[in-house]
């Protein structure tokens, strides 16, 4: 006789739906029985430029030490991040991707009877980490596909411990300005930790999108999370970080798994931070690709949501799921976002020029026969 181990799980976990990543290239290749090299994947907001050459060299140099555990404190990377970000080293928390930082926050500050506030159309990990610890999710309706910060303020109550906001937001690409952010932070109660998710901040340099680091000193209840998975091109290595007060960083460190960032990731991240030419080329490629996709959508008579990320959400004016499936048959992987409350949209990662062209041609072909 065996127990019902689903029923024995925590109530919040019982109701969870696992995170579904973008469809892997190899999986589609098996399904279609085609060469993986012929498939274009624009689904997971990865950097089409590939990894920094300096990061690859750092990984090669680290291979001889694979029998050793990594530096559990990540001293070299934390020191470099502290210098670059203008903070002290004890304000830096390293994570196995920035998702890890979000989960550490939930484990440390949320529990049954407490709640977290976040926006409609927000990153899927926010509800997952909230529900996993038995806390309540308070979802605030979006405004023009983005965060309605005044409405989010009104949703905060004495049981709120965390507010998740993203700038720019994924999957919509929307953003808010410095004045809006400052007014919001001024009014958030002191007992609420604001997690400002800046996974795509590197793509927004030179725009009107604010830098969360400019607000850290003034607001001790602010944590800024960032990642090396996007503009720095290290998605496979899983390394992210949080910047906060030393007290918050200490609390997160208490629930952090030992050796949560591996040696290859630590070495590659340090090298990637130093490769300013690579980052500049990533931004240039992204800006050109964004313009290419916008022009293509315009030619097809489609609307899209303006984006500050390395992706763009296009409105097909009809249910997107069948179009997504037809694109798969054309060997093109994009991201359906019905699970974000956007059933008529597809989210497209900015790719190389040839990849963008391949997608636009496939989309035109599919729409013509739909």
UniProtKB/Swiss-Prot annotation:
Essential cofactor(s): pyridoxal 5'-phosphate
Highest taxon above the source species: Bacteria
GO molecular function, one term: pyridoxal phosphate binding
Full protein name: Histidinol-phosphate aminotransferase 2
Keywords, alphabetical: Amino-acid biosynthesis, Aminotransferase, Histidine biosynthesis, Pyridoxal phosphate, Transferase
HAMAP family: HisC_aminotrans_2
Pathway(s) served: Amino-acid biosynthesis; L-histidine biosynthesis; L-histidine from 5-phospho-alpha-D-ribose 1-diphosphate: step 7/9
Reaction(s) the record says it catalyses: L-histidinol phosphate + 2-oxoglutarate = 3-(imidazol-4-yl)-2-oxopropyl phosphate + L-glutamate
